[in-house]
């Protein structure tokens, strides 16, 4: 399709542009000589020219005839080139290689010699016609009896004669004594059991040997009854008698109008508790409530002696909190608070309010006067 670009576009006659373009596309797309790939390429080329060059007209039928002639020439040249290539090929026939067949002579077989002939020189050779080799002992396998446990044991089935009854040959199974049978819930009382009950087996009685006592054994002395103390005498238990109210046994009334009972709650049972009379042995109760009684106090004059308890005075170290002597002091001394109050350091300050301290930041140079301090570390920037 590159040949189309060589020709100039021929303008249409007036009024025949649409019909000629229609025929042109129909003839190309319906042509059997043109390949589908060439049709697609030509159609893409036409669309490209319509979009990018709308001023140029589409080719006419004369140009279409020229294009078909060029296509035929191209196809003829391609077919000629293929024929020439086929003629130049030469098929060489390679002959098969066959080995030459030679008949072998079996009349004179080859003689093979031993590599070490000296080994056979020392062996004596006897041409007596007698085999001097000692025969080997014959090995016999003992037939041992087979193990009884090796084979499966089967019960021998007796031979059956047609004249005998079959039931006579086979023995009935042994019947075992039946034990206790659990009664089921649906079992009738009057009905009999389906299974016959057997006799119960008597339990095996174990006989115990009675050994005679040793002669050296002696009987222990009789035990004496323990004497009861008066303190551990049995305490009298007080019994309680309960009496039930007569009103609690009454039935609840049913109101016909309401259709419900008057009270759905069951009545509470009231019990009266009656104690027995007190025992005479018990001690009478004593009233232990405190009474307001006046106590006479005698006042004595206070006399202060300077020479009293001089020996008990001790030297006490406040810091170590340790007594200098072995005698324990009567008083407990407290540690002195070493932290001083600020009010004691300031003589002019009458009140106990501490003076305002100036804030100090480490590593930021000398402290400025109060009131002119900038507390931000980024003030230099």
Swiss-Prot record:
Residues 276-286 have a biased composition (Acidic residues). Residues 176-292 are annotated as: Disordered. It comes from the Eukaryota. Residues 177-186 have a biased composition (Basic residues). Residues 187-212 have a biased composition (Basic and acidic residues). This is Uncharacterized protein F54H12.4. It comes from Caenorhabditis elegans.
């Amino acid at each position: 399709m590159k040949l189309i670009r060589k020709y100039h576009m021929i303008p249409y006659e007036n009024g025949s542009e649409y019909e000629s373009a229609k025929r042109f596309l129909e003839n190309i797309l319906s042509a059997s000589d043109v390949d589908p790939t060439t049709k697609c390429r030509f159609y893409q080329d036409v669309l490209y020219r319509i979009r990018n060059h709308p001023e140029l007209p589409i080719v006419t039928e004369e140009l279409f005839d020229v294009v078909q002639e060029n296509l035929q020439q191209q196809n003829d040249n391609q077919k000629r080139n293929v024929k020439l290539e086929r003629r130049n090929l030469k098929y060489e026939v390679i002959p098969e290689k066959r080995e030459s067949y030679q008949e072998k002579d079996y009349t004179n077989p080859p003689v093979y010699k031993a590599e070490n002939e000296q080994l056979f020189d020392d062996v004596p050779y006897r041409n007596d016609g007698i085999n001097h080799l000692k025969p080997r002992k014959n090995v016999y396998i003992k037939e041992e009896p087979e193990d009884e446990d090796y084979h499966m044991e089967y019960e021998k089935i007796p031979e059956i004669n047609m004249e005998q009854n079959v039931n006579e040959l086979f023995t009935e199974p042994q019947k075992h004594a039946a034990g206790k049978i659990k009664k089921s819930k649906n079992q009738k009382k009057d009905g009999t059991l389906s299974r016959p009950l057997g006799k119960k087996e008597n339990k095996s009685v174990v006989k115990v040997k009675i050994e005679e006592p040793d002669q050296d054994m002696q009987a222990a002395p009789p035990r004496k009854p323990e004497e009861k103390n008066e303190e551990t005498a049995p305490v009298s238990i007080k019994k309680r008698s309960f009496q039930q109210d007569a009103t609690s046994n009454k039935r609840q009334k049913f109101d016909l109008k309401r259709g419900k009972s008057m009270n759905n709650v069951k009545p509470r049972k009231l019990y009266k508790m009656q104690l027995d009379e007190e025992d005479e042995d018990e001690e009478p109760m004593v009233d232990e409530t405190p009474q307001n009684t006046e106590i006479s106090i005698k006042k004595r004059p206070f006399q202060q002696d300077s020479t009293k308890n001089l020996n008990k005075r001790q030297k006490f170290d406040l810091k170590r909190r340790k007594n200098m002597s072995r005698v324990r002091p009567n008083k407990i001394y407290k540690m002195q608070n070493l932290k001083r109050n600020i009010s004691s350091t300031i003589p002019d300050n009458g009140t106990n309010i501490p003076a305002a301290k100036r804030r100090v930041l480490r590593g930021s140079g000398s402290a400025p006067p109060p009131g002119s301090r900038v507390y931000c570390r980024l003030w230099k920037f």
